[in-house]
């Protein structure tokens, strides 16, 4: 009797594993992150205000007024200046560099905040993918393919609730957990 129960569970376990392996690629495709195309880097340059973000360790001291400013140095280099205000009112900054990825996808960049002499190390570069962008380059979503990082950026310190909701719905369809987004105070 115990032998038949074990055989029954083993058959069903194998059946479930086969079923999961067949459907797993479909689930991955449904939530695959893709960068936008087409994308023109030149109008993307300038100041962006952080509207919301997924929590991350490197912004743990940022309480409000988070901004990013991008300056095109040459086609292969973009200067990145991130700044925010701490809970004590102090402004902190991080100066970095971005570059296009070698894959030819213009909205897929890599960014580093490590010193330039460490730039040869692949580990210091992080993915920076433009995932959503309005035609006027006024509202953007930036993240990475692992869905660990996500930012909503705007050319203005505030956006309408309707714009925010529409964008978060599109991001949710990409597989991002938008319920974890933290809105950023801008004043």
Where are each of the predicted segments found?
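A beta-rich soluble binding module of mature secreted/lumenal proteins
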Residues: 6-9, 26-187
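Bacterial N-terminal signal peptides that target proteins for export
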Residues: 3-15
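Bacterial N-terminal signal peptides
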Residues: 13-24
């Amino acid at each position: 009797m115990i032998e038949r129960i074990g055989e029954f569970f083993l058959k069903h376990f194998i059946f479930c594993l086969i079923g999961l392996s067949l459907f797993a690629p479909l689930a991955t495709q449904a939530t695959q992150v893709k960068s936008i195309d087409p994308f023109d880097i030149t109008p993307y340059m300038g100041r962006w205000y952080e509207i919301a973000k997924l929590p991350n360790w490197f912004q743990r001291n940022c309480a409000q007024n988070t901004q990013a400013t991008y300056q095109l140095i040459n086609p292969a280099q973009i200067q990145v200046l991130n700044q925010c205000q701490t809970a004590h009112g102090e402004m902190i900054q991080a100066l970095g560099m971005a570059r296009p990825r070698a894959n030819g996808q213009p909205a897929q960049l890599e960014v580093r905040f490590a010193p330039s002499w460490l730039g040869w190390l692949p580990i210091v570069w992080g993915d920076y993918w433009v995932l959503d962008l309005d035609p006027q380059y006024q509202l953007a979503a930036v993240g990475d393919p692992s869905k660990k990082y996500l930012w909503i950026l705007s050319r203005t310190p505030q956006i309408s609730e309707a714009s925010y909701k529409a964008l978060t719905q599109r991001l949710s369809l990409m597989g991002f957990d938008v319920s974890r987004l933290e809105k950023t105070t801008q004043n």
